[in-house]
């Protein structure tokens, strides 16, 4: 029988005995299964029959919006972990966007999260709660089934959430909340926009949530291990942009209350970038980071990596543009670690203009008294390769520089 770690004494989940979350069976959930299946069929059949590039653009934009503002900021970092403070109207808007992901209502999603979190911290964990079965069985379980425990533990949700009338309304009507945006999409673009902007969006979000969850608990790198926990989170670098930073799951298991998930050099975290923008606008405050959390004696570092801290300067865009314009003549050279892109791929992209230095914090370029890091550095080094590469770099540099300025200039603390 698993014992309850001291760290769980203040957890929202209160089981009579910890083994309560081990004893249960996985059963088909008709409503859950019908919800996902109907959305998926409508997305595939209706989406293919009415495809337009405009509708596909609506799908991409709406999916990115609800994942960033809804799931990552609203549901996860705010509602579940309360890792920053914001005006109530903005909190409501973010959480409402989270409902548009199509996973559950706000209270149901919080309960699901807390049960998994509690169970995964114990020395043993049910396969359903740990994504511990085979790939296809886990897909069936998570997308079409539910875990029915023999004795359900009590889950204590703070009255500010559980007693909130708006959240209780969303909990009762979360499936119906797809209708308002669907009606708007229909008015603008007809059935094509509905199939792509609603059905395909919900299907992609729900399926993607399971898929990332499966890999983030079974495969991927780790900076930390939680001793005594049955399940360790894993970092999935290649999906950091798609998930708005949520795929840095090992970091999240280590510091669950942190508003920042991409904690180390090269770990892109769009959710964090947006929090910095909102903070600059005065819309959020009291941001929690790892150093603000209580010490966890069970948390153990596995490598010597240090959280990203000091930025490599803040050059003006004019300086970056000047380097790009003269990149071929100046013989620009780029060096740094291969974090998101492999060293082999960087060598193919940049040729002799790249030196792999695993100990470096980030990719960097230094020339003519200007130092650039990250994506701008990659753009400048790429521009030195050929005319076509330079044209691509010209198109990408403004976005790369803007992202870098958000990362450096708006960095909390």
Specify the residue positions occupied by each region the protein language model found.
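Glycine/small-residue-rich hydrophobic helix-like segments
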Residues: 213-268
């Amino acid at each position: 029988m698993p014992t309850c770690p001291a760290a769980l004494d203040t957890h929202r989940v209160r089981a009579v005995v910890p083994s309560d979350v081990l004893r249960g069976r996985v059963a088909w959930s008709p409503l859950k299964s019908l919800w996902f299946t109907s959305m998926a069929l409508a997305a595939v059949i209706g989406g293919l029959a009415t495809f337009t590039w405009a509708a596909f653009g609506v799908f991409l934009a709406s999916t990115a919006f609800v994942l960033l503002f809804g799931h990552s900021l609203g549901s996860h970092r705010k509602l579940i972990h309360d890792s920053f403070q914001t005006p109530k109207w903005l909190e409501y808007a973010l959480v409402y966007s989270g409902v548009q992901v199509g996973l559950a209502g706000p209270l149901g999603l919080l309960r699901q999260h807390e049960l998994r979190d509690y169970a995964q911290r114990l020395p043993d964990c049910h396969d359903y709660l740990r994504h511990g079965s085979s790939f296809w069985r886990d897909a069936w379980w998570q997308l079409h089934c539910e875990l029915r425990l023999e004795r359900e533990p009590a889950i204590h949700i703070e009255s500010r959430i559980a007693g909130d009338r708006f959240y209780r309304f969303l909990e009762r009507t979360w499936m119906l909340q797809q209708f308002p945006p669907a009606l708007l999409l229909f008015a603008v673009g007809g059935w094509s926009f509905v199939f792509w902007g609603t059905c395909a969006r919900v299907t992609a979000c729900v399926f993607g949530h399971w898929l990332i969850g499966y890999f983030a608990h079974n495969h991927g790198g780790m900076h930390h291990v939680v001793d005594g926990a049955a399940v360790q989170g894993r970092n999935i670098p290649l999906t950091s942009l798609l998930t708005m930073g949520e795929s840095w799951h090992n970091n999240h298991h280590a510091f669950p209350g942190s508003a920042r998930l991409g904690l180390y050099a090269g770990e892109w975290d769009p959710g964090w970038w947006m929090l910095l923008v909102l903070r600059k606008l005065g819309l959020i405050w009291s941001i929690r980071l790892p150093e603000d959390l209580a010490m966890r004696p069970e948390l153990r570092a596995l490598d010597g990596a240090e959280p990203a801290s000091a930025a490599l300067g803040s050059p003006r865009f004019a300086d970056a543009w000047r380097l790009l314009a003269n990149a071929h003549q100046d013989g620009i050279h780029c060096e740094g670690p291969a974090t998101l892109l492999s060293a082999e791929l960087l060598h193919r992209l940049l040729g002799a203009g790249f030196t792999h230095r695993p100990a470096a914090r980030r990719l960097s370029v230094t020339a003519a008294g200007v130092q650039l890091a990250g994506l701008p550095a990659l753009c400048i080094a790429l521009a030195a390769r050929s005319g076509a590469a330079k044209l691509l770099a010209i198109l990408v540099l403004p976005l790369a520089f803007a992202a870098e300025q958000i990362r450096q200039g708006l960095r909390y603390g």
